From Swiss-Prot:
Stated family: Belongs to the nodulin 20 family.
Claim: Disulfide bond is one of the keywords in the record: no
Keywords for the protein's UniProt record, in alphabetical order: Nodulation, Signal
Region (Disordered): 99-120
Gene Ontology biological process terms in this record: nodulation
Pfam families hit by this protein: Nodulin
Keyword check for Transmembrane: no
Name of protein: Nodulin-23
Organism: Glycine max (Soybean)
Length: 220
């Protein structure tokens, strides 16, 4: 009974914290604890890329309906209540156009200044493992015991806990609002590349410079 009461109070406190005005948070205050990075990192670049792709039909359409990009950001922020991996996989499957086709990259002229976005690639995170050689299998004779291999059960993806889900949604909702407001109020919004604004702005919101426990901004 005591555990149930404590859980209810934690849920109420987290819900109240989520409803606190988003406009009161600055970019630095939107930073979340490092243990949530593993949930935010795979989603951040995909949110920016997908929302920028939906608004890539032209700067004129964007200027006529500036709420379109904000709506896309809010939609993805609300959908992040589900497990991040499931949302990421579903969204990638539903994409009809590759971001590289929507935003073609021009080759950097020789001697020109190279931007960090020139190496931009939209791919899920991958881990490189060192090469590992299996030991040679022993030769089995007619009198050798029978070796039975028991397959290990598949590892199911871990769902976010209630508190982690609320914290993640709050952080992403705050950062998407900051990103949309920053990119849509830029003086050259009609002629600038939205992709060049969305990804760095989202990175800066989640991983602000000078954060005590922060890591270098991720590259989408």
């Amino acid at each position: 009974m005591r555990v149930i009461v404590i859980t209810v109070f934690l849920f109420i406190g987290a819900a109240i914290a989520e409803d606190v005005g988003i406009g009161l948070l600055s970019e630095a205050e939107a930073y979340v604890s490092p243990k949530l990075k593993k949930f935010i990192t795979p989603c951040t670049s995909h949110v920016g890329e997908t929302c920028s792709t939906t608004s890539s039909s032209g700067s004129e359409a964007l200027m006529q309906n500036q709420g379109g990009l904000l709506f896309a950001f809010r939609f993805y922020g609300e959908m992040l209540g589900r497990p991040c991996a499931q949302l990421y996989q579903t969204s990638v499957t539903n994409l009809q156009v590759e971001p590289s086709e929507v935003f073609p990259r021009k080759n950097n002229p020789q001697g020109g200044r190279k931007s960090k976005l020139d190496d931009h690639q939209v791919q899920p995170l991958s881990f490189r493992l060192p090469p590992f050689r299996l030991p040679p299998m022993p030769k089995l004779g007619p009198t050798s015991p029978i070796i039975r291999t028991i397959p290990s059960p598949p590892i199911a993806p871990r769902d976010l806990s209630l508190i982690e889900t609320i914290q993640l949604r709050t952080a992403l909702r705050t950062c998407t609002h900051v990103t949309a407001r920053t990119c849509l109020t830029a003086p050259n919004v009609a002629t600038s590349d939205l992709e060049a604004c969305l990804t760095p702005s989202m990175n800066q919101c989640i991983y602000p410079r000078g954060a005590e426990y922060g890591s270098p901004p991720i590259r989408a």
